[in-house]
Swiss-Prot record:
GO terms for cellular component: nucleosome; nucleus. One of its GO terms (molecular function) is DNA binding. Keywords: Chromosome, Developmental protein, Differentiation, DNA condensation, DNA-binding, Nucleosome core, Nucleus, Phosphoprotein, Spermatogenesis. GO terms for biological process: chromosome condensation; nucleus organization; spermatid development; spermatogenesis. Testis. The modification Phosphoserine is found at S8, S10. This is Protamine-2.
Length: 103
């Protein structure tokens, strides 16, 4: 009985304190949500932008320019070497593979 009373007494202040803290947390949650949302958004944007940025960097100016140059030179010879080398190295880009296969 005493243990039960001790538990109830210990639970009640936690409940009351929890309600107060929860009430304060609700006030803080508005601020924390605003504080956490930008953090989550930043992390999400970092991961999202990071992947898209890598994709853009892999296939953007330099690579496409090199591909165009190689096409004009001799695509068949360069195509085999470059595609194999790219696949081994960075697994190549789909656009590059498609363009190499087409030409």
């Amino acid at each position: 009985m005493v243990r039960y009373r001790m538990r109830s007494l210990s639970e009640r202040p936690h409940e009351v304190h929890g309600q107060q803290v929860h009430g304060q947390d609700q006030g803080h949650n508005g601020q924390e949500e605003q504080g956490l949302n930008p953090e989550h958004v930043e992390v999400y944007e970092r991961t999202h932008r990071g992947h898209s940025h890598h994709r853009r960097r892999r296939c953007s100016r330099r690579r496409l320019h090199r591909i165009h140059r190689r096409r004009h030179r001799s695509c068949r010879r360069r195509r085999r070497r470059s595609c194999r080398h790219r696949r081994r190295h960075r697994r190549g880009c789909r656009t590059r593979r498609r363009r190499c296969r087409r030409h």
